[in-house]
Amino acid sequence: MCASQKNQELIGGLILFSAALLAIVVNNSPLASYYAMLETINVKLGIENLVIDKNLMHWINDGLMAIYFLYIGLEIKREIIVGTLSKPSNIITPAIAAFAGLAMPSLIYLSINHDIKVINGWAIPSATDIAFTLGILALLGTRVPAKLKLLVITIAIFDDIAAIAIIAIFYTKSLSLLSLSLGTLFILAMIICNRIFKINRSSVYVVLGFFAWFCTIKSGVHATLAGFTTALCIPFRENDKDSPANFMEDSLHPWIIYFILPVFAFANAGISFSGISFSILFEPITLGIIWGLFVGKQLGIFSILAVFKKLKWFKLGESFSNLQLYGISLLCGIGFTMSLFIGVLAFNDTHLLNAIKIGVVVGSVLSGFFGYIVLRFIVTNPS
């Protein structure tokens, strides 16, 4: 990662944090009525019977986040073809660690929450916010070696793949087979353009991807799946920055970290303290998310990394101390935007959403704070 990219990740992380803090301030000020307009102002897109009519909040969650998952898909495709995921030896341990980091928080959440009304939130503490995590890694600088950062990114990539699968499978509330079939046809059209006609114009994939996204929303499947699958259909050529995948990834990167994620954070992190008592911190759903992110994530990921290192099944891990592995395991508990995203898909009750937001913020802050402390002050020989 070059110096400019490190600066972008650091600045992006600070903007993301500031956007979330601003949302909380605005929603607990005289401007709260304007903040509420995110859910009351509707915007229509389409013609005649082919119309999507959603409020601003849904456009952010269904539209902007689809672009974010398009970017994630482009990153994953590059890593599979020429990056760390191109070597099987680099895949196994991070993949298992990511799975453990998904399973353990979910189990902790379910062990605390037995009410059928809140069980649907089991996936909320399973996510990792790679943007925030990279921001803290950038803040740590040389205290975190390049290979250790690469390990964090690889775990986060598998975490993102799991999140996409979870959203598609568990948070699809209704299904229109006609719209889904039409969306699939647009995906197939992109594959044909890429593999058969060898079309390298980015605009072709943008247009076809837009129609795939439109049909996916109409089908009831969450639009993020369209963003991800579109990315996998876009041509990638090694060492060619002008290939559509490389061009789109580079073009989207600043928009993702400086606009899309901060806007999402502002729209979804606005906890309203009106009518909320301190006891909300001790409600099962809040505790399940806090302990899932702060305890479950570190326990699941670190246990796999440490055991595999001890058994010499993890060659990359031999160059790291257990404290370093523990530090990055803590950082993976920063769920923030991804956890909030799953939360708004799982519930629409205002009280539950406030409990979710508090749980996500507290769990993420604890994970980020202690992860930073371990890697900055406790690890004695970072190199």
Swiss-Prot record:
<feature type="transmembrane region" description="Helical">
    <location>
        <begin position="206"/>
        <end position="226"/>
    </location>
</feature>
<feature type="transmembrane region" description="Helical">
    <location>
        <begin position="10"/>
        <end position="30"/>
    </location>
</feature>
<feature type="transmembrane region" description="Helical">
    <location>
        <begin position="174"/>
        <end position="194"/>
    </location>
</feature>
<keyword id="KW-1133">Transmembrane helix</keyword>
<keyword id="KW-0406">Ion transport</keyword>
<dbReference type="InterPro" id="IPR023171">
    <property type="entry name" value="Na/H_antiporter_dom_sf"/>
</dbReference>
<feature type="transmembrane region" description="Helical">
    <location>
        <begin position="91"/>
        <end position="111"/>
    </location>
</feature>
<dbReference type="GO" id="GO:0015385">
    <property type="term" value="F:sodium:proton antiporter activity"/>
</dbReference>
<keyword id="KW-0050">Antiport</keyword>
<keyword id="KW-0997">Cell inner membrane</keyword>
<feature type="transmembrane region" description="Helical">
    <location>
        <begin position="254"/>
        <end position="274"/>
    </location>
</feature>
<feature type="transmembrane region" description="Helical">
    <location>
        <begin position="327"/>
        <end position="347"/>
    </location>
</feature>
<dbReference type="Pfam" id="PF06965">
    <property type="entry name" value="Na_H_antiport_1"/>
</dbReference>
<keyword id="KW-0813">Transport</keyword>
<feature type="transmembrane region" description="Helical">
    <location>
        <begin position="150"/>
        <end position="170"/>
    </location>
</feature>
<dbReference type="GO" id="GO:0005886">
    <property type="term" value="C:plasma membrane"/>
</dbReference>
<comment type="function">
    <text>Na(+)/H(+) antiporter that extrudes sodium in exchange for external protons.</text>
</comment>
<comment type="similarity">
    <text>Belongs to the NhaA Na(+)/H(+) (TC 2.A.33) antiporter family.</text>
</comment>
<feature type="transmembrane region" description="Helical">
    <location>
        <begin position="289"/>
        <end position="308"/>
    </location>
</feature>
<feature type="transmembrane region" description="Helical">
    <location>
        <begin position="56"/>
        <end position="76"/>
    </location>
</feature>
<dbReference type="GO" id="GO:0006885">
    <property type="term" value="P:regulation of pH"/>
</dbReference>
<keyword id="KW-0812">Transmembrane</keyword>
<feature type="transmembrane region" description="Helical">
    <location>
        <begin position="355"/>
        <end position="375"/>
    </location>
</feature>
<dbReference type="InterPro" id="IPR004670">
    <property type="entry name" value="NhaA"/>
</dbReference>
<keyword id="KW-0915">Sodium</keyword>
<keyword id="KW-0739">Sodium transport</keyword>
<protein>
    <recommendedName>
        <fullName>Na(+)/H(+) antiporter NhaA</fullName>
    </recommendedName>
</protein>
<feature type="transmembrane region" description="Helical">
    <location>
        <begin position="121"/>
        <end position="141"/>
    </location>
</feature>
<keyword id="KW-0472">Membrane</keyword>
<keyword id="KW-1003">Cell membrane</keyword>
